[in-house]
Amino acid sequence: MKAVESNFDGLVGPTHNYSGLSVGNIASKSNQSGVSNPKQAVKQGLEKMKALHDMGFVQGVLAPQERPDIHTLRRLGFSGSDSEVLKKSYQYSPQLLAACSSASSMWTANAGTVSPSADTTDGKVHFTPANLINKFHRSIEDQVTGNILKATFSDEKHFVHHEALPHSDYFGDEGAANHTRFCREYGEQGVEFFVFGKSAFNESYLAPKKYPARQTLEASEAIARTHGLREQFTVFAQQNPDVIDRGVFHNDVIAVGNKNTLFCHQQAFLNQEKVKSDLCASYGSGFNVIEVPTDKVSVQDAVETYLFNSQLITKADGTTLIILPEHCRQNSRVWAYLNELIEQKRGIDELHTFDLKQSMQNGGGPACLRLRVVLNEAEQKAVNQHTLMSEELFTTLNLWADKHYRDRIEDKDLADSQLLVESRSALDELTQIMHLGSIYPFQK
C-alpha cells in the first residue's frame, strides 16, 4: 500500500502571548513581555497548512490546549471561582499564570514521537506524547495531548497510543523535535534517528554547561522499546553540547531529515563523523548528508534564522522542497548559501518561505509547528477526516478565529476572566467542527 508522510500542524491557541518562558530558547526570551496577536498567529499557521494542502500533501490540524489552565492553578493552591483563581494567581505569581496560559502546544513537533507501521513489530502506528518535563509550562500538556491524538487517530486496528514517559528528569522527552526518520519509500522499513542531549544515568557523557539538555538518552531508548522498533534500524546520537549552549535547544534547530537526506550543520552532533557512519550503515547505499559548513553559515545565523527548523518534503514528482521561515530570506549569508545549494543539485530542489513572525518571535519555525505522521492508504482512511485540511476546513477555521480570537494580548490580559470565557467558547466550538468529542477538562 502506498504511504505518505502527512503533516499535522498545531492550531495556535487563543491565549498566544510572549511570556519568555523557555530558558535556552533565545527568541522566546528576547521577545518577553511583547504584545502578541493571537488572531494573526493562528491565521499565519492556517496559511502554511493550506499552502501544503494546495501542493498536494496530506495536511492535518491538531487542536490546541485549554488555557489558562485553571485545573493546574487550583492544584497549586489558588481557590475560589475561576475568575478569583485568575485574579489571585496574577496578584501573587504572574509568572505562574503566564506559564498556565501558554499557547506553546502550537509547536506539535513536541507533541510526541510517532513511529509508522512499517517500522514497528506489530505493524501499527505508535504514538507517545512527550512529557516535556524540562519546562513547567509544557510539562502540563501531555494528558490533553494524548486526548487530542486519540481523537485524531482513534482506530485501534491501526493506531497504538502510549502514556507519556514518567515525569522525571531521568526521562526528559521532547518528542519529534529530537527524532527523525530516513527511508527509501515512506511505506518501507525506515531508520529511526533519536538525538539526545545528555545521559541521566551515565555521567561519562558530556553535557551542556549554560543551558539545559532537554532530551535524555534513556528517554529515547525507552520510546524505541515501547514502539517495538528493530534495533538494526534504530540510531541514537548525542547533540553537540556546545551548540545547546548557543541556543540550539532541540535537534530540529540544527538538523532536519527526510527520506535519504540529512540536512545538518557541521557542528550539529558530538562525534559527527561516527553519527554519519552509523546512519549510513543502518540505511545502506544512497544515504545523502548535506552538511552546512560553519564558514558558510554560523551557528548564530542558524539559530537566528531557524534555517534547520524547516520542513524537508518530497513532492509527488520526487523533487524535494524545503519550507523555510521568511527570516532565512532576510539573512544574506543564509540566503546565499541556500541558493548555492539549489544550484549544486545536492538533493534539495526548491525553496519556499513563509511569514511565521508570531511563532518565530516565541522561538518556533515551520518544523516546530508540525508533527510528521507516515500513513499508508488504510491508515489515512482511519484518521478522523474532520481534522484534515480542505478548502472547507480552511474557511471554517478562519471564520472561527475571526469570531473568537483577540488581535492583541499583553501580560495583564491573562488575568482577564473574559479571556478564559472566550478561550473555552472557542475550544468548545472547535471540538464540534473537528468532531473531537470532550477532550478538555472544562467539558467533562
UniProtKB/Swiss-Prot annotation:
| Pathway where it operates | Amino-acid degradation; L-arginine degradation via AST pathway; L-glutamate and succinate from L-arginine: step 2/5
Q: Which residues bind substrate?
A: 19-28, 110, 137-138, 214, 252, 362
Q: Which reaction does it catalyse?
A: N(2)-succinyl-L-arginine + 2 H2O + 2 H(+) = N(2)-succinyl-L-ornithine + 2 NH4(+) + CO2
Q: What is its EC number?
A: 3.5.3.23
Enzyme class, first EC level, given as a word: hydrolase
Claim: Iron is one of the keywords in the record: no
Pfam families tied to this protein: AstB (PF04996)
Molecular function as annotated in GO: N-succinylarginine dihydrolase activity
List, alphabetically, the SUPFAM superfamilies matched: Pentein (SSF55909)
The UniProt entry's GO biological process terms, in alphabetical order, are:
arginine catabolic process to glutamate; arginine catabolic process to succinate
Q: Which UniProt keywords apply?
A: Arginine metabolism, Hydrolase
What does the record give as the active site?
E174, H250, C368 (nucleophile)
Functionally, this protein is described as follows: Catalyzes the hydrolysis of N(2)-succinylarginine into N(2)-succinylornithine, ammonia and CO(2).
Which PANTHER family does the entry link to?
N-SUCCINYLARGININE DIHYDROLASE
User: Would you identify the family this protein belongs to, as annotated?
Assistant: Belongs to the succinylarginine dihydrolase family.
Q: How does it assemble?
A: Homodimer.
NCBIfam families on file: arg_catab_astB, PRK13281.1
- Descriptive protein name: N-succinylarginine dihydrolase
Native species: Aliivibrio fischeri (strain MJ11) (Vibrio fischeri)
